[in-house]
């Protein structure tokens, strides 16, 4: 029960819509079956993975819900509205559980038990806002909106949340470079401008404006971000190719046998930074 494993289903579903084939149908059914049986919190939000029991991560919303929403009319014909309702419910409950009013940002994850070593014992929240996790959360909204019919009334809830999230994202855009730091809620010289999250935010700003979800001020921020990505991260190599630099390779929270993955700022800064990470390119 690993939501990361479901993410390729979104691409496969789009391919299947163009070129239907039995072997792909079997794979799609298998992925949908996983989601239909994925363990959930008491409030009905999927666990990120079985090894992260009763935990909701922003990452997981992107890994599972876009496929779930897109595939519903094909894999559950006649019941797609139930899937849409579930998707909107999960994303709004994730908002409610991970949003931090003090920073106007969303924390990386929430532990339902409030007992994980990385979790605040009062709120269950992890310590910080990891930029890529928030990038995944905002990209999930864009992709879910692609799949929800315009006639589906609760779709507006996702638009409202997306507008609120991108307002906060723009507030944290670095004024000089136009891109974003790896940990958004920490002002520290060790923090660094990070390419994968910056690419995600640029995508959300530009597509959000193109689709009519965001007004012109967000277009300006998106163009600034795009230019910043080229200037700050894109490097021309000696052989004539280009690289996307300053990509965080990975960041996580636990499990128990990895106590150094504690969600501290120091932990996020300890993870490897490399060129051309697939999550950026």
Residues of each region from the PLM?
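Well-ordered alpha-helical scaffold segments within catalytic/enzyme domains
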Residues: 7-21, 65-79, 136-154, 199-214, ...
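Solvent-exposed loop and edge beta-strand segments that line ligand/cofactor-binding
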Residues: 1-7, 48-61, 119-139, 150, ...
């Amino acid at each position: 029960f690993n939501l990361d494993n479901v993410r390729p289903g979104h691409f496969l579903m789009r391919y299947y819509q163009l070129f239907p084939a039995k072997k792909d149908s079997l794979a799609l059914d298998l992925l949908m079956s996983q989601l239909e049986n994925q363990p959930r919190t008491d409030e009905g939000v999927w666990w990120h993975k079985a090894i992260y029991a009763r935990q909701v991560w922003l990452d997981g919303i992107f890994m599972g819900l876009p496929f779930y929403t897109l595939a519903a009319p094909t894999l559950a014909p006649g019941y797609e509205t139930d899937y849409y309702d579930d998707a909107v419910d999960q994303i709004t409950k994730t908002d409610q559980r991970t949003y931090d009013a003090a920073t106007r940002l969303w924390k990386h994850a929430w532990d339902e038990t409030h007992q994980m070593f990385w979790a605040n014992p009062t709120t269950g929240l992890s310590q910080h806002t990891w930029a890529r996790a928030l990038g995944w959360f905002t990209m999930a909204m864009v992709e879910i909106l692609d799949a929800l019919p315009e006639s589906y009334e609760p779709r507006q809830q996702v638009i409202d949340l997306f507008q609120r999230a991108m307002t906060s994202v723009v507030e944290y855009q670095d004024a000089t470079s136009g891109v974003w730091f790896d940990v958004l809620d920490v002002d520290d010289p060790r923090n660094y401008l990070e390419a994968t999250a910056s690419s995600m935010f640029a995508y959300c700003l530009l597509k959000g404006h193109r689709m009519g979800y965001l007004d012109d001020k967000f277009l300006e921020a998106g163009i600034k971000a795009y230019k910043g990505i080229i200037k700050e991260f894109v490097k021309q190599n000696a052989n004539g190719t280009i690289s996307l630099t300053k990509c965080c390779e990975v960041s996580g929270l636990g499990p128990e046998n990895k106590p150094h993955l504690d969600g501290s700022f120091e932990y996020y800064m300890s993870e490897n930074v490399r060129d051309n990470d697939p999550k950026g390119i």
